[in-house]
A protein has these predicted regions:
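Short, ordered loop/turn segments at secondary-structure junctions
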Residues: 27-28, 86-87, 122-126
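Glycine-rich phosphate/diphosphate-binding loop of Rossmann-like nucleotide-binding domains
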Residues: 11-56
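Short, charge-patterned binding micro-sites
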Residues: 60-61
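Structural motif
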Residues: 22, 64, 79-81, 115-121
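Glycine-rich phosphate-binding loop
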Residues: 64-106
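Short glycine/serine/threonine-rich phosphate/pyrophosphate-binding segments
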Residues: 4, 33, 65-66
Length: 158
């Protein structure tokens, strides 16, 4: 089953010319996260966000997304952040521990700074599942994460 998220691009309250967006990409599983980054960034450009207002950073792995998000919110005055990563199950439960720590950490950072952080971290059983969610037949989670951030910003800018 593909994604059921409908990208309506209906953002009544956003002034795209003044938005400043952060995108933080994990380099682990970069063949996947590169695709997520391209589609996320392209979506922001398509809706009219100026390229100079999109700040991108790369971190070694998904765990580092938490620290980097906190740092970006403190030092770059962004309105919100898209985090992109790919955690693929291995032989142990390590993936679950990483995914839980990252999701909980990003929620904490978002609440601490009162700014939205969109969770574009894939958690899959294998590489093919990840590819199918990075623009394949199961959706484009990079684009969907960018859309989700804009929907949240539209909500809070009322």
């Amino acid at each position: 089953m593909g994604s059921s998220l409908i990208l309506d691009n209906n953002f009544d309250n956003l002034n795209f010319s003044s938005l400043k967006i952060g995108i933080i990409q994990s380099e682990w599983n970069s063949k996947i996260t590169d695709l997520l980054m391209i589609s996320s960034r392209n979506y922001f450009l398509e809706v009219g966000i100026d390229n100079k207002n999109i700040i991108t950073r790369k971190v070694p792995g998904s765990m580092e997304l938490v620290y980097a998000s906190n740092h970006m919110l403190i030092n770059h005055d962004v309105d919100g952040i898209v985090t992109l990563g790919c955690i693929i199950k291995g032989e142990t439960d390590h993936d679950k521990h990483i995914a839980n720590a990252v999701s909980n950490g990003l929620v904490s950072v978002s609440i601490k700074h009162n700014k939205p952080i969109s969770f574009g971290v894939l958690t899959t059983n294998n590489h093919n599942q990840a590819l199918s969610r990075a623009g394949g037949n199961k959706g484009d989670k990079g684009k969907e994460s960018a859309y989700t951030l804009l929907k949240m910003l539209d909500l809070v800018w009322v």
